[in-house]
Swiss-Prot record:
It comes from the Eukaryota. Acts as a neurotoxin by inhibiting an ion channel. One of its GO terms (molecular function) is ion channel regulator activity. This is Turripeptide OL135. Belongs to the conopeptide P-like superfamily. It comes from Iotyrris olangoensis. The lineage of its organism: Eukaryota, Metazoa, Spiralia, Lophotrochozoa, Mollusca.
Length: 74
């Protein structure tokens, strides 16, 4: 019975060191070519609350919404 508890404690200590955990936890956006196009569009058109488009998921989502609202036919 003690082995699973010890194993869980070891895993909890190691997990923050893993690269995948850090990416998930930080919620940072890796800005690829498409992301860069959206962010440049938002910068050029002074979209509000998208200043951190390249690094913040929430700002990036706002930028995509701004882009689609202004560029998709209705």
């Amino acid at each position: 019975m003690k082995v699973p508890i010890v194993l869980m404690l070891v895993l909890l200590l190691i997990m923050p060191l893993s690269d995948g955990y850090e990416r998930k936890r930080x919620x940072x956006v890796e800005c690829n070519e498409t992301c860069e196009e959206f962010c440049t569009y938002c910068d050029d058109n002074n979209a509000e609350e998208t200043e951190n488009c390249r690094t913040d998921q929430t700002d990036h989502s706002r930028c995509v919404d701004f882009y689609t609202a202004n560029n998709l036919p209705t």
